[in-house]
Amino acid sequence: MNISAVFNALLVSIMAAVLWKHVKLLEQFYVIEEELELTRQSQELSQVRIDYQAALQALVEDGTRMVCSGRMHTDRVCRFESLCYSTEAEEFVFFHSNSSIMLPNLGPRRFQPALLDLSSVDDHNTQYFNFIELPAAALKFMPKPVFVPDVALIMNRFNPDNLMHVFHDDLIPIFYTIQQFADLDFESRLFFMEGWNEGLHFELYKFMSNKQPLLKEQLKTLGRLLCFTKSYVGLSKITTWYQYGFVQPQGPKANILVSGNEIRHFAKFMMGKLNITKDQNAAEAYIVLFSRSMNRLIVNEAELLLALAQEFQMKTITVSLEDHSFADIVRLISNATMLVSMHGAQLITSLFLPKGAIVVELFPYGVNPEHYTPYKTLSTLPGMELQYVAWQNTEEENTIAYPNRPWEQGGIVHLDKTEQERIKKSKEVPRHLCCRNPEWLFRIYQDTKVNISSLIQVIKSKTKLGSRRQKWTQGLYPGKVRESKCQASAQGTGEAKLFVSWQIPWNLKFLKVRDVKYEVWIQEQGENSYMPYILSQQNYTFSENIKPLTTYLVWIRCIFNKTLLGPFAEVLVCNT
């Protein structure tokens, strides 16, 4: 072998080593550049700085962690660490490692039908949330994640173009979900995953966070794999009061858990965001009439305005969602004496009315007010203290229908002639499910000539103008009665008496309560029935059906104002 060949071989080896080192340095440079870009993308989302390498290592080693509250998918909200979302697959991803936590660990029950509802609407099959599962090792074969450093609230808006749905389904539940979990506050970021665009009322959603809410479509611009360092998924439903008729005809929820106190607290928050100061000493009483411009019109609106002003000796003001800013509408309603409106989403603004105000809801011909009560239910929540009146047009000649419109605006020409005639002759829409019942749509989109004398008579008979605005203490419940005692006395062998006494509940001495009563149950031990008594005093001697040599169980509770039932005190065991 000549020296030239040896030299060439050595040179090739050196060149290969240098080239390999250069390639490795280039690869490392690209990795660093990619990580810097991913860090930059994270910084675009939030001002919170993130150590990308540490975040990636934590994701690989710890995987995803989940702890949920609630027993069923309909009442569950879940807290996640390192929940990820693939914008390509449009799927949430749970990465498993030896350190992962999944509570509850439901196995296949997670798909029956879902882990949770993404919106506050119960058990709607378009609102279900779930995730797919992967081992954390799969991250090696996936796009590098972009980390979201903000605490995220991930949810669906149910119908962001309808003001009633915006408030009832979204804004109020968001507000109280934030109150419920310590990690959530107004520095958290909202992620709307239902797929809608911003919608008509997006500015209202911005009040719920100091950071811009993000839509599902916008996530694709942030990266192929997003990982939320900390997130909450789902909404608390504790503030909702109405169900929309997906399973049974619409009506108030069976178990309403919210009061007017919470609704008014939310209203105060919103008014602050709208820069509205409530005028506690408004000099002039006035009536607000909601005007509609597209459908469900009041055809004699000007005449109605004049009649209301003359009858109640108040100024009347018209507002509309089309011609007034939302802030202006709330500013007017928050000091109004009366709000008059056709049935519709705009009536959700009644939650801004002052206590004692009157809500007048008008219904077209054939639409029974007792079947459609979201605003009646709101008005009559304990603590709302609004006076509610429903008026229905019962005169067919005072209605204008539009059978030739598209079906979604109440048209019925797409139906066969027999069905069209049946609907036209019908006097009342039967109870029905949501949401495309043609008879309901035909009637609800009618225009109405209001019988003014009939309406005024209904308002005057069911309300009291200038009614005293009660204080929230009227809705406070009594505590347990204290120091309950019983003493028996025998009257020969066949008769006995039972003297029972107790002290007032501890909280009663701090309250001004108009009516205080006590309910006493007496049950002979071993029997299923009991004898109930309602008493005004704090002691009583019972003789009716009291037998000697018998053991009686006695329960006592306090009642405020006939409806506020306190808890029973510990049972008394009394022997005659």
From Swiss-Prot:
PANTHER family noted in UniProt: GLYCOSYLTRANSFERASE, PROTEIN O-LINKED-MANNOSE BETA-1,4-N-ACETYLGLUCOSAMINYLTRANSFERASE 2
Main location: endoplasmic reticulum
InterPro entries associated with the record: FN3_dom, FN3_sf, Glyco_transf_61_cat, Glycosyltransferase_61
Protein name: Protein O-linked-mannose beta-1,4-N-acetylglucosaminyltransferase 2
Organism: Xenopus tropicalis (Western clawed frog)
Gene from which the chain derives: pomgnt2
Record keywords, A-Z: Endoplasmic reticulum, Glycoprotein, Glycosyltransferase, Membrane, Signal-anchor, Transferase, Transmembrane, Transmembrane helix
SUPFAM superfamilies in the record: Fibronectin type III
Residues exposed to the Cytoplasmic side: 1-4
GO (cellular component) term, any one: endoplasmic reticulum
EC number(s) stated in the UniProt entry for this protein: 2.4.1.312
